[in-house]
């Protein structure tokens, strides 16, 4: 099964948290990272009184179900010190399951595709970079969605994540 995961960090050594998340995802059984985007530095969305984020997107192949993969990602967040005290607040690591086999799902814990991905440059731009044909079900192609957004605040970060 093909999945798209967005990564973000804005506390501490942001790059190290992103790399640690990649390393932990690589340790998951029955899961293989296929592509890793460049890293982008972005301003916060929603709760604005916090540091800038580093963001990236990965695609992976997994034998887990979408719900199982989500639980694995949440455990990685916990292992890397993620706290959820402020909605959309600062975080060591954020791992969002954006798409899973182009499926539509809405449960108490998971909504696919991610309900706000289509309006977030920090998801769309790195995703498009690693999949030029990417699209969000019922929203359209990533390349078209980006045209409707102001993505000027997204800056390429000089370091690369290693798989």
Protein language model annotation of sequence segments:
Residues 61:
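Glycine-rich and small/hydrophobic secondary-structure elements
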Residues 35-37, 44-53, 64-70, 75-163:
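Flexible, gly/pro- and Lys/Arg-enriched active-site loops
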Residues 1-31, 37-43:
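N-terminal beta1-alpha1 ligand-phosphate binding loop
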């Amino acid at each position: 099964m093909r999945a798209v995961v967005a990564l973000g960090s804005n506390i501490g050594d942001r790059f190290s948290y992103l790399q640690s998340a990649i390393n932990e995802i690589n340790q998951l059984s029955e899961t293989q990272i296929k592509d890793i985007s460049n890293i982008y530095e972005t301003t916060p969305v929603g709760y604005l009184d916090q540091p800038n984020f580093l963001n990236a997107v990965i695609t992976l192949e997994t034998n887990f179900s979408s719900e199982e993969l989500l639980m694995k990602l949440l455990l990685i967040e916990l292992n890397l010190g993620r706290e959820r005290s402020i909605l959309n607040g600062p975080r060591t690591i954020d791992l969002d399951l954006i798409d899973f086999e182009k499926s539509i799902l809405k449960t108490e814990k998971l909504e696919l595709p991610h309900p706000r991905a289509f309006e977030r440059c920090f998801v769309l731009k790195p995703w498009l970079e690693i999949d030029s044909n990417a699209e969000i079900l019922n929203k359209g192609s990533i390349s078209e969605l980006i045209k409707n957004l102001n993505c000027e605040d997204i800056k390429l970060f000089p370091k690369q994540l290693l798989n």
